[in-house]
Amino acid sequence: YSKFFLTYAGSPWLQEEVSRNEEMAERLGFGSVPDLKKGVARRLRQYVDGGGFLLAMCSATETLELALGAEHADIAASYSDGSPPDPNATSKMEWDLTMGFMDGVVQTSPSVNAFSDIDAHQVNTPWRLELGVFPLFDFSAKFDPVPAMLTQNHVSVISDFYGLTTSFRMDRLKPGAIVLAKDGNIAKYVHGNLGEGTWTYFGGHDPEDPEHQIGDPPTNLDLHRSSPGYRLI
């Protein structure tokens, strides 16, 4: 349920999501919603390893990796499985099970609205970074066809935009990760290989709504037909 639960526990839309996830976990034979999410993460990794292509954005990037690494660690809040997270969860993370990130420090405090220190911008915390711009790297279509395809655009510099996970610390990327775009020493858009497939992570929620808030209306894409951010998506 993300850490939206801290603020929106009484909201009908979140209560509906909780009920839907609990029903699904029970129906599929999982002991809890976190166990269900870990199972989904494992299947996604298997999909990529077997030749699939994965694009994830916003918190789907960071939380997928944390779920993979927490195979034998409890990082879930008590409101999701009835037990508090393990205070030593960070030391029990298995980064060899993840695809793109490593060495993250898990944020287990229920009062801090962040998942880990993988995200550089920490949008909902007191140490939030301001938005800037991110230049796209220029790749050779001959020698790097996939990165060249992923960065194809009509502009070379794009305005940044927030998300629950906005960006990625460079020192949290595995050595094989390819940075497609970054702002200084902060990666925005990354790509990598796993087995026969590839994964691509793009930080942020909505390129045309950089300060997106709960309850905001959906972006009307008809008004943004030349959006460079949506072109990447």
What are these regions (language model features)?
Residues G10-S11, N153, H191-L194:
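Extended, composition-driven regions rather than compact fold-specific motifs
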Residues A41, D74, D171-I178, K182-I233:
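Extracellular ligand-binding/catalytic regions of CAZymes and related secreted enzymes
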Residues V18-M24, A76, G82-D86, G132-V133, ...:
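Short, surface-exposed, polar/charged, turn-prone segments marking secondary-structure boundaries
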